[in-house]
Regions:
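Bacterial N-terminal signal peptides that target proteins for export
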Residues: 2-13
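N-terminal signal peptide c-region/cleavage motif recognized by signal peptidases
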Residues: 22-24
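Boundary of Sec targeting at the N-terminus
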Residues: 28-30
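Active-site mouth of glycoside hydrolases
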Residues: 32-210, 215-217
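Extracellular glycoside hydrolase catalytic/binding regions
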Residues: 57-58, 142, 149, 153-158, ...
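Hydrophobic beta-strand scaffold residues
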Residues: 115-117, 273, 308
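Histidine-bearing beta->alpha loop at or near hydrolase active sites
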Residues: 163-164, 308, 314-316
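C-terminal functional modules
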Residues: 330-357
């Protein structure tokens, strides 16, 4: 989520929204398709640590989940705040917040969609960097061990280590990612797919740039997963500085080229990739065409891409946010036209996508 978006939300989130609860569940799903075609349903990462449910933050409603399931999306990337789920480092998870997380997961499962758990913290806890004295790697590993135990070996739940590590040395982030992954595989005994970002907001366009030490593309090649079931997560926007804040698509060709270059890196190293965030305004043909071009890169290279989740939607998103594809009273947002071919065409099902354990 961008700085601009956070400012909009801070002003807009003044009223609570009641969550629609669903008690229905289904047995652990063998996913309908082998590739993720998903949506970020934002809301549980809103506000400050603590906060009141349905006043300061919310989890996705039944209405919203059902809408995106009806459009063919098969995955929800589910952002939330680490500090709410674990109010004290190295201590048990908060029972009430775990309950809300579980309700959201079951609500999504009821529509036969997968869930990506996304601590949306930019490699920070209460403002302090992971791998620092105040938030040591052991604390990050402890958090993931506790969280992973909730869904260990339930393969419709995927573990996204962290949203957009930012302004953190790559060596520091790599150590933290390795320790968290070791805890997931060891202490939690979980073999779920893990999504691993780089630093510098994990941009595809900057994957080979030495921004915080070595380039992501050099350092993250040393990432270690004892379970060997992971994919590298990148984000990519199309505006002037690739931040998603400028409400234009001036760098659309560069954004598509960035995904193509990342595809080559994945293939060269024998890795899998995942496009966790991408989005653009819906009011211009150029933007719609560029979004489709980005989706096409992932769909045309299923030997290395596990799929994508569009940013953004959610019950509390303001209608003025141009990347938002939460439906309006008038109907669908125009960006769906770029995503629809991939949502409806599953002709390659089971053939070309990397297998998910």
């Amino acid at each position: 989520m961008t700085q601009k978006t956070r400012k909009i939300l801070k002003a807009a989130l003044t009223a609570g929204v009641a969550l629609a609860m669903s008690g229905s569940t289904f047995a652990q799903a063998t996913a309908a398709t082998p590739c993720f075609r998903g949506i970020n349903l934002s809301g549980a990462e809103f506000g400050k640590p603590g906060g009141k449910i349905n006043k300061d933050y919310t989890w996705p409603s039944e209405e919203t989940v059902a809408y995106f399931a009806s459009k063919g999306f098969d995955t929800v990337r589910l952002p939330f705040m680490w500090e709410r789920l674990q109010p004290k480092l190295m201590q048990p998870l908060d029972k009430d917040e775990v309950g809300r997380l579980k309700e959201a997961v079951e609500r999504i499962r009821a529509h036969r969609m997968r869930i990506i758990l996304d601590p949306h913290n930019y490699a920070r806890y209460n403002g302090h960097l992971v791998g620092s004295e105040l938030v040591p790697d052991a604390a990050f590993g402890d958090f993931w061990a506790r969280l992973a135990k909730l869904y260990a070996n339930e393969h419709d739940v995927i573990f996204g280590l962290m949203n957009e590590p930012a302004k953190i040395p790559i060596a520091q982030w790599l150590n933290a990612a390795n320790q968290a992954t070791a805890a997931i595989r060891g202490k939690a005994g979980a073999d779920n797919l893990i999504l691993v970002p780089g630093t510098a907001w994990t941009g595809a366009h900057s994957w080979m740039q030495p921004i915080y030490g070595e380039p992501n593309g050099v350092a993250m090649a040393r990432f270690e997963d004892p379970g060997k079931n992971f994919a590298f997560e990148v984000h990519q926007y199309l505006d002037d500085d690739f931040s998603g804040t400028k409400n234009n698509c001036s760098r659309s060709d560069d954004a598509v080229d960035a995904l193509k270059s990342f595809t080559l890196w994945l293939r060269e190293h024998g890795f899998r990739g995942f496009l966790g965030e991408f989005g653009a305004p819906g009011g211009k043909v150029r933007c719609i065409d560029a979004l489709k071009g980005m989706v096409d890169v992932t769909e045309d290279n299923k030997d290395v891409w596990t799929g994508w989740t569009y940013w953004v939607a959610g019950d509390w998103w303001p209608a003025t946010e141009e990347l938002n594809i939460q439906p309006t009273a008038e109907g669908d947002r125009p960006q769906l036209a770029a995503l629809k071919p991939a949502l409806s065409d599953f002709s390659a099902e089971g053939k070309n996508c990397p297998s998910l354990n």
